[in-house]
Curated annotation (Swiss-Prot):
Keywords: Antiviral defense, Cytoplasm. Pfam families: RAMPs. The gene is cmr1-2. GO terms for biological process: defense response to virus. This is CRISPR system Cmr subunit Cmr1-2. CDD domains: Cmr1_III-B. Belongs to the CRISPR system Cmr1 family. The keyword Cytoplasm applies. It is found in: Cytoplasm. Part of the type III-B Cmr ribonucleoprotein (RNP) complex. This is an elongated RNP with Cmr2 and Cmr3 as the base, with Cmr4 and Cmr5 forming a helical core along the mature crRNA (39 or 45 nt in length), while the complex is capped by Cmr6 and Cmr1. The 5' end of the crRNA is bound to Cmr2 and Cmr3, while Cmr6 and a Cmr1 subunit (Cmr1-1 or Cmr1-2) cap the 3' end of the crRNA.
Length: 187
């Protein structure tokens, strides 16, 4: 059996949820979904217009309604950090908090809830739900008995981590992870 364990750390806030929209969730199904997307993006160039061949290989790696996956994906949260986007921004940006605040507004406007305090006339900023903050640690494990499909899944995860992101607002820079350690084993 082939196995790889990716120890990861969030370098930008990660907005990923499950059935409970208020609490963060880092699930295997979500990770597998993003891996599948990157597999399609990369393998499309190899398979060209042969969509049936692409679909067949994709089903073997990630599974389908007819066949189970040949690669087992397990995602775990190791260390959760929760925070406030604006507090985090001020510690990063020191004297440029105004510029940073506008940046945060632009990238994370859909997850911020702004309300004006009637007494102080200041805007109170609260996030609408919890999220995984910078520094949260995760682990993703891939395992398979078939080396070919294992390597394809491993490449897909590698591309997801390095070129993509997890959760929503990933296209705006959220959900970026870095690999702390990669352990590969042949069992």
């Amino acid at each position: 059996m082939y196995e790889a364990i990716f120890d990861l750390e969030a370098i930008t806030p990660l907005f990923m949820r499950g059935a409970d929209a208020r609490s963060p969730e880092f699930s295997s199904a979500s990770v597998k979904g993003v891996m599948r997307w990157w597999f399609r993006a990369l393998a499309g160039g190899y398979f060209g217009n042969n969509i049936e061949a692409l679909k067949e290989v994709e089903e073997k790696i990630f599974g389908s309604t007819r066949n189970k996956s040949r690669v087992f994906v397990r995602a775990e949260v190791e260390d959760v950090k929760k925070g406030n986007i604006y507090r985090q921004a001020s510690s990063w940006a020191d004297k440029t908090i105004i510029v940073w605040s506008e940046y945060v507004d632009y990238f994370f406007f859909s997850v911020l809830d702004k309300r004006r305090n009637r007494k102080t006339k200041k805007i109170d900023i609260k996030t609408r739900f919890e999220y995984f903050d910078v520094g949260s640690k995760f682990s993703i494990s891939l395992s398979s008995t078939d080396e070919r499909y294992f390597r394809l899944a491993e490449a897909s995860l590698w591309m997801t981590i390095n070129l993509g992101g997890f959760g929503f607002r990933a296209r705006r820079g959220a959900g970026s992870l870095k690999v702390q350690m990669l352990r590969e084993m042949l069992l």
